[in-house]
């Protein structure tokens, strides 16, 4: 089980408790602060983080994903990456593509803002476990995550055309 899947399980358990209403409000409010800096969100994330040895940027990624999960009311769709969801939204919209490219270029100071914009833009849920797993590797010098996201985004149209041809055949 990946770190993202473990954290998503944690969030789903929290979502099933009475505390979810307060947690969801705290997570949503936390989007106005740097990830991990809003004290009211800490009681809902720190117990999970205490179980591991996380670097600061990894801690921030957990807080950011929790906030984005709350923003989407826990609408998790396994396998639907943010890149794919943005491609679906971008049909006929150059501005969505520009936002996607800005997201791919986001540094540590910009990532929370860019991700919040992107997640709010798409309709329906995304794979939050995969999002966290990707964020945990986002700042790697090789930029493998950003390259994969670009392939998923720009390759989505090609895969849609292939599916249509298979159905027609």
Curated annotation (Swiss-Prot):
> Could you describe the subunit structure of this protein?
Homodimer.
GO BP terms in the entry = defense response to virus
Stored Pfam families: CRISPR_Cse2
Say which species the protein is native to.
Thermus thermophilus (strain ATCC 27634 / DSM 579 / HB8)
Arranged from A to Z, the UniProt key words for this protein are: Antiviral defense, Plasmid
- Family to which this protein belongs: Belongs to the CRISPR-associated CasB/Cse2 family.
Q: Which gene encodes it?
A: cse2
Would you indicate the residue range of the signal peptide? none
Q: What is this protein called?
A: CRISPR-associated protein Cse2
What is the recorded function of this protein according to its Swiss-Prot or TrEMBL entry? CRISPR (clustered regularly interspaced short palindromic repeat), is an adaptive immune system that provides protection against mobile genetic elements (viruses, transposable elements and conjugative plasmids). CRISPR clusters contain sequences complementary to antecedent mobile elements and target invading nucleic acids. CRISPR clusters are transcribed and processed into CRISPR RNA (crRNA).
Q: Which NCBIfam families match?
A: casB_cse2
User: Sorted alphabetically, which InterPro entries does this protein's record hold?
Assistant: CRISPR-assoc_prot_Cse2 (IPR013382), Cse2_sf (IPR038287)
